Regions:
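Short beta-strand-to-loop capping motifs
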Residues: 8-10, 54-59
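An amphipathic, aromatic/His-enriched active-site/gating alpha helix that lines ligand/cofactor pockets
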Residues: 58-88
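Short S/T/G/P-rich N-terminal loop/turn motif that feeds into the first structured element of a domain
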Residues: 1-34, 38-40, 44-50, 89-94
Length: 94
């Protein structure tokens, strides 16, 4: 399983339509589920370096990147994926 965090930044278009953002977030969770991605949490982070963070788990990187391409095509957000490792996974790496 691949764990990670998707960092989300609103575009100008996304900022103009911010009131629709919670509905878009719910729709994005449904889109993720269709691709086999479990959304563990979705946090808005106003005032932070990013506008939101989505904690996910998936079978591999391909569905994650497909999800990001699909969601970003709306023009409301830009996304970056950061792989996350458990303590046990980190122990194996070091």
């Amino acid at each position: 399983m691949v764990n990670g965090v998707i960092l989300v930044d609103l575009t100008d278009q996304g900022r103009r339509t911010i009131k629709e953002s919670p509905d878009r977030a719910e729709a994005s969770k449904a889109e993720a589920a269709k691709l086999g991605i479990q959304v563990k949490n979705l946090f808005y982070t106003p005032g932070g370096p990013h506008d939101a963070a989505i904690v996910i788990e998936a079978e591999g990187p391909e569905p994650i990147h497909k999800f990001m391409v699909n969601i970003q095509s709306s023009g409301n957000v830009k996304m970056k994926f950061v792989r996350a490792f458990s303590i046990e996974e980190m122990r194996k790496m070091i």
